[in-house]
């Protein structure tokens, strides 16, 4: 199967998981990116079962609305039973690198309030150690050089994310992103806490403190379900 076919496979598997485990009338937390889009497309077929969704980005909001799925602000919701999102990398503990699509801060906020985080990914995203995929850090623009120096001191190579026109990429929150290459993150929870404590960091794209509860992993043999210890 192609990577796109695997994404559609796990998107449908996530919709099936939601149908089986989330009661009718609930609100679903939805991530951002090409794999999350496959979940949205599959969820559209059963949208009448649920009140709607909480979105993690402007792009996801637009896709949800295009399917006629009502989008709620997180502040309107008392409880969120499930959050479904992709990952750029995921390790054996359920810790992830996320943010390749630029929505890491809102993704982390929505994930933090959900009872269950369901990661959907193709098999290429499973890694023994996080860091081959550049680690995104959303930063307040005036802090980007200072943050870059801190990253370099840890052995990373900071690269400012830019648009195709060469201008700094701006997040939905009005900030910039530094992508850090050359890392091997053996202790993702400690590394997440360290980077998040730097002045000027909005959030780092490590999801270790709040990692995945389970992963629906698309492989040539079908969908593998991996459950991570709490």
Curated annotation (Swiss-Prot):
Record field: catalytic activity: aldehydo-D-ribose 5-phosphate = D-ribulose 5-phosphate
Which UniProt keywords are present, listed alphabetically? Isomerase
Q: What CDD domains is this protein classified in?
A: RPI_A
Q: Pfam families, from UniProt?
A: Rib_5-P_isom_A
An example of a Gene Ontology cellular component annotation for this protein is:
cytosol
Q: Which InterPro entries match?
A: NagB/RpiA_transferase-like, Ribose5P_isomerase_typA_subgr, Ribose5P_isomerase_type_A
What does the record give as EC number? 5.3.1.6
Pathway(s) where this gene product acts: Carbohydrate degradation; pentose phosphate pathway; D-ribose 5-phosphate from D-ribulose 5-phosphate (non-oxidative stage): step 1/1
* Chain sites annotated for binding substrate: 32-35, 85-88, 98-101, 125
Q: Catalytic center at which residues?
A: 107
Q: What does this protein do?
A: Catalyzes the reversible conversion of ribose-5-phosphate to ribulose 5-phosphate.
Q: Which family does it belong to?
A: Belongs to the ribose 5-phosphate isomerase family.
Q: Which PANTHER family match?
A: RIBOSE-5-PHOSPHATE ISOMERASE
Q: Which NCBIfam families match?
A: PRK00702.1 (NF001924), rpiA (TIGR00021)
On subunit structure and binding partners, the annotation says: Homodimer.
Q: What is this protein called?
A: Ribose-5-phosphate isomerase A
Instruction: Say which species the protein is native to.
Output: Burkholderia vietnamiensis (strain G4 / LMG 22486) (Burkholderia cepacia (strain R1808))
